[in-house]
């Protein structure tokens, strides 16, 4: 797997997203702009300028018409993908750490930071998919996280629940219509934050990554932990691969703790685990610092990782990846 190296950011990457077709990658970093790239050759499609602080998060609607971003300038912005025009800006009291469209992109959730006396919240905004139409200023729903602030959040299948990961290592399930807290489960070790939450293709289960050096596969309906992937380094990101039963984990020794260690000692690799058997099956090296974000092509043909080193590395899976099977998997096919 020879990677395509994308050099468009001057500072550490914060999030990467593929569009639903898997042909465009959107990346955000701490350098105040969003980049769009063609996934197959790494050509830069364009950049989106307007934020005045580090951009923490980005998401794209299913039709690749609009993207949303959240940043340290306390705003959520909506952009026209084709023209790069900023369609709408929503202001908040604190930084926005995560945005995600629901399945039909009629709503957008935003996770705000707990800071300066303001509690962390999850806010739902109504979205108009017509780029020439008006956008509403109103918040459709506000969930206040009084116990422990939310660090990540997303929509479950059919936009039925909002699932949030918290700073104290717990995961919550909220009713997406009313904002009522339905479940709260201590998925990770207490006081080690959930750093990422990404969905299976059908959104019935999700994977979380945490500073406790594990990733967990969790059922969205009752927050039951189905699988646990144990590593030897704090994790920043985790993703589920379609087509094959794998998960990809990214992390590494925290950037502030890295002194003169080699890349190998820092454990700056993307790790592949078997989704069912919970065993590590391979690693991909390359970044000169922790991996902050990993994302998988929705078609299952490749993945991209973004690091503290400011690079995005896009990998296309080769034949060996698709051919790899366990003995029990081969036997099951033959029967």
From Swiss-Prot:
GO BP term, pick one: formation of cytoplasmic translation initiation complex
PROSITE patterns, per database record: WD_REPEATS_1, WD_REPEATS_2, WD_REPEATS_REGION
Keyword Protein biosynthesis: yes
Location within or outside the cell: Cytoplasm
Chief localization: cytoplasm
One Pfam family recorded for the sequence: EIF3I
WD repeats: 8-47, 50-91, 145-184, 189-228, 286-325
Source organism superkingdom: Eukaryota
Keywords, alphabetical: Cytoplasm, Initiation factor, Protein biosynthesis, Repeat, WD repeat
A GO CC term attached to the entry: eukaryotic translation initiation factor 3 complex, eIF3e
MF (Gene Ontology): RNA binding; translation initiation factor activity
Primary role: Component of the eukaryotic translation initiation factor 3 (eIF-3) complex, which is involved in protein synthesis of a specialized repertoire of mRNAs and, together with other initiation factors, stimulates binding of mRNA and methionyl-tRNAi to the 40S ribosome. The eIF-3 complex specifically targets and initiates translation of a subset of mRNAs involved in cell proliferation.
Subunit structure: Component of the eukaryotic translation initiation factor 3 (eIF-3) complex.
HAMAP family in UniProt: eIF3i
Family the UniProt entry places it in: Belongs to the eIF-3 subunit I family.
Protein name: Eukaryotic translation initiation factor 3 subunit I
């Amino acid at each position: 797997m020879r990677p395509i190296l994308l050099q468009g950011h001057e500072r550490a990457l914060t999030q990467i997203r593929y569009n639903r077709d898997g042909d465009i990658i959107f990346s955000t970093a701490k350098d105040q702009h969003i980049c769009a790239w063609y996934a197959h050759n790494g050509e830069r499609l364009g950049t989106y300028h307007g934020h005045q602080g580090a951009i923490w998060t980005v998401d794209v609607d299913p039709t690749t018409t609009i993207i949303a971003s959240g940043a340290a300038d306390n705003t959520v912005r909506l952009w026209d993908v084709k023209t790069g025009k900023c369609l709408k800006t929503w202001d908040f009291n604190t930084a926005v750490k995560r945005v995600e469209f629901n399945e039909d992109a009629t709503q957008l959730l935003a996770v705000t930071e707990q800071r300066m006396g303001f509690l962390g919240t999850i806010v739902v905004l109504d979205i108009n998919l017509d780029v020439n139409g008006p956008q509403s200023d109103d918040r459709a729903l506000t969930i206040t996280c009084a116990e422990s602030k939310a660090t990540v959040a997303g929509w479950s299948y059919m936009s039925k629940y909002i699932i949030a990961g918290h700073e104290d290592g717990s995961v919550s399930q909220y009713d997406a219509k009313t904002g009522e807290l339905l479940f709260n489960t201590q998925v990770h070790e207490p006081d080690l934050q959930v750093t990422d939450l990404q969905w299976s293709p059908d959104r019935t289960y999700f994977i979380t990554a945490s500073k406790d050096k594990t990733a967990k596969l969790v059922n969205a309906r009752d927050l039951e932990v189905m699988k646990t992937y144990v590593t030897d380094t704090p994790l920043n990101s985790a993703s589920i691969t379609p087509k094959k039963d794998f998960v990809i984990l990214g992390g590494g020794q925290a950037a502030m703790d890295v002194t003169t260690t080699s890349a190998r000692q820092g454990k700056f690799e993307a790790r592949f685990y078997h989704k069912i058997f919970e065993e590590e099956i391979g690693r991909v090296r390359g970044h000169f610092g922790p991996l902050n974000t990993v994302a998988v092509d929705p078609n299952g043909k490749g993945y991209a990782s973004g690091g503290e080193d400011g690079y995005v590395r896009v990998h296309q899976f080769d034949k060996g990846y698709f051919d790899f099977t366990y003995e029990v998997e081969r036997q099951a096919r033959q029967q």
